[in-house]
Amino acid sequence: MHPAFSVIFLTTLLGAGQGLYLAMVTGQLYAVARFLPAQADQFYAVGSLVALLLLIAGLGASFFHLGRPERAWRAAAMWRTSWLSREVIVLPIVMALVFAYGVAHWFEWTQPLFQVGAALQVDLTLLLGVLGTIASLALFVCTAMIYAAVRFLQEWHTPLTVSNFLFLGAASGFMLAAAYSAYIGNPLVTFYGTWAVILTLVGLASRLAHLRRNARLKHKSTVQTAIGVRHASVVQKAQGATGGSFNTREFFHGRSQSLLERLRTVYLVLVFPIPVLLIGLSYLIGSSNLPIIAFFVQFAGLLIERWSFFAEARHPQNLYYQSVA
């Protein structure tokens, strides 16, 4: 498939924004459970603002993928059958909850609303945090299922697509939370850094499983089945047209297989071992710069990973354009 940069930035920015928001809520839940010291409300408010800006940037990137942006609102009409429509509906809900969560913390609306059990007092920020967490997880699923639900693109049609979007997005968000904490000198950098490492390693396991699965795929369609010829050796000599077309532009990435393999190595290094090593090194030497570097290195790797994700999908129609695709 053709990797559109608008969709690459959409998915990576949304993932980082959702992940950062989940990191803020996780930190608050740990503080409520007294596993972490309580933080100033402004800490969560600023973190939520950054998460909201990432979500807005991702939404803005999506408009560059539309032929008629003024009709974007119609994308929500098919919510009963379309994961894209569901994403269009869930995204503004997530953005509204992130905004409300940040505002509630900024104005310190922390008076208890009700009590659960003997000790847990639920205030507005905690309630919004839980609702936002549920919505964010739903958004991860909706975004990933846009691709995982496409049956004829066998590289995508697997639950591993959903796990990749979830864990890689969460890892980048927690890595950003560690960078944010390091930048302002907050001691939670260790907490967020540790969670970022855990999520990164889980994401590595998921991505490697996805790559291994795709390497063993047996495609249902071949040249023989496409044209109804049983001969063992069928080779296309020409695509039947003298120039390119929509089919050759939109359903093929136009790069060599060797480039894909090199990029795969690059993103596997940038997304996984380097950030983990940088976080570990920051613990040893007490550097506040290394978590920040770790986030930017990982995010750059995620852009390459997402490009490769789209490029790896082999559309069956390319059987008719083998001299190009």
Curated annotation (Swiss-Prot):
Biological processes per GO annotation: anaerobic electron transport chain
This protein's record includes keyword Transmembrane: yes
InterPro entries: DmsC (IPR007059)
Record membrane topology: Multi-pass membrane protein
Disulfide bridge partners, by residue number: none
Any Pfam family hit: DmsC
Molecular functions (GO terms): dimethyl sulfoxide reductase activity
UniProtKB keywords: Cell inner membrane, Cell membrane, Membrane, Transmembrane, Transmembrane helix
Keyword Membrane part of the UniProt annotation: yes
Location of this chain's protein in the cell: Cell inner membrane
Membrane-crossing residue ranges in chain numbering: 5-25, 43-63, 87-107, 126-146, 165-185, 186-206, 266-286, 290-310
GO CC annotations, alphabetized: dimethyl sulfoxide reductase complex; plasma membrane
Function as written in the Swiss-Prot or TrEMBL entry: Part of the SoeABC complex that catalyzes the oxidation of sulfite to sulfate. SoeC probably anchors and stabilizes the catalytic subunits.
Family: Belongs to the DmsC family.
PANTHER family: ANAEROBIC DIMETHYL SULFOXIDE REDUCTASE CHAIN YNFH (PTHR38095:SF1)
Subunit and partners: Forms a heterotrimeric membrane-bound complex composed of a catalytic heterodimer (SoeAB) and a membrane anchor protein (SoeC).
Record protein name field: Sulfite dehydrogenase subunit C
Species, as recorded: Allochromatium vinosum (strain ATCC 17899 / DSM 180 / NBRC 103801 / NCIMB 10441 / D) (Chromatium vinosum)
